[in-house]
Amino acid sequence: MPQNRSMESQAYSLPLILPDLRREEAIHQITDTLQHLQTVSNDIFSRILQRVETNRGQLQRINGRLSLAQAKIERLKGIKKAIKVFSSAKYPAPEHLQEYSSVFAGAEDGWLAKKLRHKIQSKHRPLDEQAVQEKLKYFPVCVNTRGQDEESAEEGLGSLPRNISSVSSLLLFNTTENLYKKYVFLDPLAGVVTRTNPALEGEDEEKLFDAPLSITKREQLERQTAENYFYVPDLGQVPEIDVPYSLPDLPGVADDLMYSADLGPGIAPSAPGVPIPELPTFITEDITENSRTDSQDGRLLPPPPPPPPPPPPPPPPEPSVLSPPTSLAPPLPIPAPARVGSSDVGDPGSLQGAPKEVVNPSDGRASLLESIRQAGGIGKAKLRNVKEKKLEKKKMKEQEQVRATGGGGDLMSDLFNKLAMRRKGISGKGPAAGEASGDGPTGAFARISDTIPPLPPPDQASGDGDEEDWES
């Protein structure tokens, strides 16, 4: 009988012709095997041809798409118009891919379905033991060793079962005996031995390994610097290309390119992704006009206080009580528009450091600006601090008191003190010689006049003449 040894991965199987058959029986098996071989070979080649035809059809469809795309490209080569090509973000493939199927998928072995029966007329030959023994020298023989395995299994429980999942299921409880290999009668709880501490029994302890050199020799390992693997893109140097704006009549170049779409931010982080926002524009015309009207109306700055009435020109003091010379009086810190508005109201005597021809202005703003230019402006004016003036007055009063007390018996000193007090009374700086108390209106006027800076002498020549008049 033929042996059908087919595997699961094989789609076809062929029977083998056994030796030592009768002639008629051998002929029948040979014919049946050859017929089955022809059937299998025909099926194999038909399946291969079918797969080749399928692949050929797919290749023809791909070639058709390629030829169509090539024809479109050839047509677009001569056009001088700009063409936008929209590419899909997804790969042009079906959602569900077709799984690969084997060429021999679904093949059936017809030999297993066939059950051919032939009636043999010839009889079996008698068995020849000597011929069988001679054939054992040339043919492999399967020896049955099952009996020996059964005899060796009598010592234990036998082969290991398939449902063992752990070592504890293999060994005897609380022991190291494998009962499947050697079966022994042993009480697992009787032979329990407690192990004592090996240090108490004098056993040698296992020594630890030596410490590393970094601990024994106090050496410090050098810290290795970690390498930086971060991706830092660099734009590099972009070459400057000087080309004309338009190149007409070039083959393969469109002449109606219009780049009006926003390209979006760049991919390089070093390049500025977003343009710098522009600041909002402020309307300054209304603000300037309002400020001008306020300055003209006198609402931008408080109006300056009215100047006091001009006192009579004081005589030049003696060298002993002479105050520090001041070339120019400090002008009032008022902007030009405000001063123009208040020039009509103020007194001409308020311009102390200006020349004489500017005191009586003829035409408003022009004469005022001219007087400021002639006086040298604010930068050339020698301004003095109010605190320094007060300290100087205080020192002068102390010196006068010391001189008055120290030279009381001298006739010339008494005359000098009286003359100085008289001059102060005339100039408004202090009480006159005939006034005994300062509680009257003259004392209040003197205190007010002390807060006002003194007027400088208008001219050196006039000062000399006044001094001569006083001495005479």
Curated annotation (Swiss-Prot):
Biased composition (Basic and acidic residues): 385-401
GO CC terms in record: cytosol; early endosome; early endosome membrane; recycling endosome; recycling endosome membrane; WASH complex
Subcellular localization: Early endosome membrane; Recycling endosome membrane
Disordered: annotated span: 289-365, 377-412, 426-472
Cystine bridges: none
A GO term, aspect molecular function: actin binding
InterPro entries, per the entry: WASH1 (IPR028290), WASH1_WAHD (IPR021854), WH2_dom (IPR003124)
Region: Required for WASH complex assembly, residue numbers: 1-51
Region described as VCA: 352-472
Keyword presence, Membrane: yes
Domain notes: The VCA (verprolin, cofilin, acidic) domain promotes actin polymerization by the Arp2/3 complex in vitro.
Role noted for this protein: Acts as a nucleation-promoting factor at the surface of endosomes, where it recruits and activates the Arp2/3 complex to induce actin polymerization, playing a key role in the fission of tubules that serve as transport intermediates during endosome sorting.
Quaternary structure note: Component of the WASH complex.
Similarity annotation: Belongs to the WASH1 family.
Name by which UniProt lists this protein: WASH complex subunit 1
Source species: Xenopus tropicalis (Western clawed frog)
